[in-house]
């Protein structure tokens, strides 16, 4: 059958449906660089730009409409403005409806972020369903993450599929059921790592090596005594602190109550003014948006960190200076896995605004549009043939002591897009594009159940 690929990006829907023998007859993508790549990879398919400028009658007839419509208005990482998005991206769903109204394709296949069903307390999703129903479509929806099918990435996405009702008001959608992921499936990041990949690699910066060394020491010391790692975030600013917080937030306390207490890192709060005293508190206590109330979850987090410090004060006081010279985000830490192998080299590391996070080797987190959160693979070896940095300079083996960031080739493998030609995209541009793409294998699994079987050419 013929299909169109709207908000096409790298062409994930195109790859998946082509595998099943269907033919793409039209694509739309507003990003000019991605347009060029689409033409490079699919030269026989006409691709246009801004969908709002394309007349529905200029789009070829088709039986399937595919669209990974813009997710930022509904995502956790975006502002979650939905249909009120200031850039107009939320209203792009209406462009899909405009094309459906004109062409009436039998099938629709849409993809968005997992936050969409709950956006605006469910009202956004309710409007989408109402609009599709008014156009004659029965729909089903489901949230899948690639790791449920053995693909080593945790990336929940919301899939919407639908069929057009016939003159008798029947669509056949009642026969469709989403695939149930296999039980006990195991994924492993190492399955997508190529030890000899040396194309535009980015090693962990050397100034991060002592930071990782220090946190590795911290984990070893805590687990040696306690036998486990706390699941809460480690805020080193609370180590040695004793300022009061249970009744009134410190930013609203009197000078007399603050003076003489210990603030961030156990340092004495000193100064003649409230501003000087508050400046010595942890950064999250310097805010004044809370007055007579303070969130209970923050109180719990502070108590947990102070209790951790008291259990380990004998060695933390000697350890803390090792981490103090580094940026604030590197002085916070989270052990985000149930795995009790305490060696960082057997996990995935992520640098986040909320701190350093250790994750399971079973899957990488979402390849985000924020390249600073790109997963680090500390187990990735130094290629036997050497490697060059992004400026073309040779790396040394010691540069890889803490591994490297996931490569753009590995990111493509995770999204099942390794067969594409990425032209002259920079590493950052490629990772961003892959982070916004649909997972080809997951789309193919759903399409197999939705669409009639076709024999690939």
Model-derived regions, located:
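A SAM-dependent methyltransferase catalytic signature shared across enzymes that methylate proteins
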Residues: 128-143, 164-168
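C-terminal target-recognition/interaction regions appended to catalytic cores
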Residues: 238-457
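A short helix->loop->beta-strand "cap" motif at the edges of active sites that frequently abuts
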Residues: 103-106, 137, 156
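Flexible, glycine-/basic-rich loop-and-beta segments that form/coincide
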Residues: 151-242
């Amino acid at each position: 059958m013929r299909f169109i690929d709207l908000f096409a990006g790298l062409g994930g829907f195109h790859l998946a449906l082509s595998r099943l023998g269907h033919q793409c007859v039209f694509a739309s993508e507003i990003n000019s660089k991605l347009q060029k790549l689409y033409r490079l990879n699919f030269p026989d398919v006409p691709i246009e730009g801004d969908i709002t400028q394309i007349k529905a009658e200029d789009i070829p007839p088709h039986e399937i409409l595919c669209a990974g419509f813009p997710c930022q208005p509904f995502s956790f990482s975006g502002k979650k403005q939905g249909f009120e998005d200031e850039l107009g991206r939320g209203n792009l769903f209406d462009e899909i409806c405009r094309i459906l109204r004109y062409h009436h394709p039998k099938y629709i296949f849409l993809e968005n972020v997992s936050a969409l069903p709950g956006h605006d307390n469910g009202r956004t999703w309710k409007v989408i369903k109402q609009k599709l129903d008014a156009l004659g479509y029965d729909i089903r929806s489901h949230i899948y993450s690639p790791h449920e099918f053995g693909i080593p990435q945790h990336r929940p996405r919301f899939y919407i599929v639908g069929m057009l009702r016939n003159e008798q008001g029947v669509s056949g959608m009642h026969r469709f059921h989403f695939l149930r992921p296999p039980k006990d499936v195991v994924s492993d990041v190492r399955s997508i790592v190529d030890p000899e990949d040396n194309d535009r690699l980015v090693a962990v910066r050397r100034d991060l090596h002592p930071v990782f060394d220090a946190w590795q020491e911290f984990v070893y010391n805590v687990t040696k005594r306690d036998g486990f790692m706390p699941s809460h975030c480690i805020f080193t600013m609370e180590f040695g602190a004793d300022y009061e917080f249970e009744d009134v937030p410190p930013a609203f306390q009197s000078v007399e109550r603050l003076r003489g207490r210990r603030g961030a890192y156990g340092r004495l709060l000193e100064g003649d003014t409230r501003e000087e005293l508050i400046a010595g508190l942890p950064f999250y206590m310097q805010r004044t948006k809370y007055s007579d109330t303070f969130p209970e979850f923050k109180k719990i987090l502070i108590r947990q960190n102070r209790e951790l410090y008291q259990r380990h004060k004998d060695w933390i006081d000697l350890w803390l200076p090792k981490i103090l010279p580094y940026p604030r985000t590197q002085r916070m830490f989270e052990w985000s896995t149930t795995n009790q192998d305490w060696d960082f080299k057997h996990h995935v590391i992520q640098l986040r605004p909320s701190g350093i996070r250790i994750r399971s080797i079973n899957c990488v987190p979402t390849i985000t549009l924020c390249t600073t959160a790109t997963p680090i693979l500390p187990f990735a070896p130094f290629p036997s043939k050497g490697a060059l940095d992004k400026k073309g300079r040779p790396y040394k083996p010691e540069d890889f002591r803490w591994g490297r960031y996931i490569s753009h080739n590995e990111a493509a493998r995770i999204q099942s897009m390794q067969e594409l030609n990425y032209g002259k995209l920079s590493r950052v541009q490629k990772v961003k594009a892959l982070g916004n793409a649909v997972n080809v294998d997951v789309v193919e699994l759903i399409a197999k159940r939705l669409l009639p079987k076709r024999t690939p050419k």
